[in-house]
């Protein structure tokens, strides 16, 4: 991806250097679809944080990721804007994180089928001058599936790759 570093526009303003602090293929795809010119820099920050309400959890993790990447650039380029994001599933009072393996993915999908759960995404946009964090919550219903359907879906590798088993990322709606 080509990145524009403070390239002067016709009106004398300057283009900011936009960085996505995420390795998520889906987030890259979304930013590309809206025509943003950006660089991907993944965060190596410690993401182990204390338990808290899901909306606070995703905002905190998105902030940790964005701030970690911003720190790498803050002294060199004050035109940097960093976007960090984190997504989790929340079901029956529990934050569900990325499945450890196929059996864990099966257990999680089995617990979600036929029920509504919430998907929370927190986003932080930060620069050396300002930070903004917000979250969105979506109710998701997973239909009842046979064990074979679940195992077939898991065999694609999608559930283990995505934090919250979002089949809609690849079109395999559940």
Model-based region annotation:
Residues 5-14:
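Short, Lys/Arg-enriched N-terminal segments with co-localized hydrophobic residues
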Residues 8, 164-174:
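Residue-level detector of conserved catalytic or cofactor/ligand-binding positions
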Residues 16-19, 40, 53-166:
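Anionic-ligand binding patches
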Residues 16-36:
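N-terminal beta1-alpha1 ligand-phosphate binding loop
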Residues 39-46:
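A short beta-strand-loop structural module common to alpha/beta enzyme folds
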Residues 48-50:
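Generic structural signal for helix capping and beta-alpha/helix-loop junctions
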């Amino acid at each position: 991806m080509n990145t524009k570093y403070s390239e002067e526009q016709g009106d004398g303003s300057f283009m900011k250097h936009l960085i996505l602090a995420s390795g998520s293929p889906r987030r890259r795809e979304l930013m590309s679809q809206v025509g943003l010119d950006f660089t991907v820099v993944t965060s190596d920050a410690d993401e182990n944080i204390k338990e808290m309400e899901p909306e606070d959890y995703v905002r905190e993790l998105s902030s940790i990721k964005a701030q970690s990447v911003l720190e790498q650039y803050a002294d060199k380029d004050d035109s940097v804007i960093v976007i960090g994001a984190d997504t989790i599933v929340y079901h029956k009072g529990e934050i569900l994180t990325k499945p450890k393996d196929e059996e864990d993915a099966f257990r999680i999908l089995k617990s979600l089928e036929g029920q509504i759960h919430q998907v929370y995404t927190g986003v932080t946009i930060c620069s050396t001058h300002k930070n903004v964090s917000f979250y969105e919550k979506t109710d998701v219903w997973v239909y009842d599936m046979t064990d074979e359907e679940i195992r077939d879906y898991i065999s694609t590798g999608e559930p283990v790759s995505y934090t919250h088993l979002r089949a809609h990322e690849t079109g395999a709606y559940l």
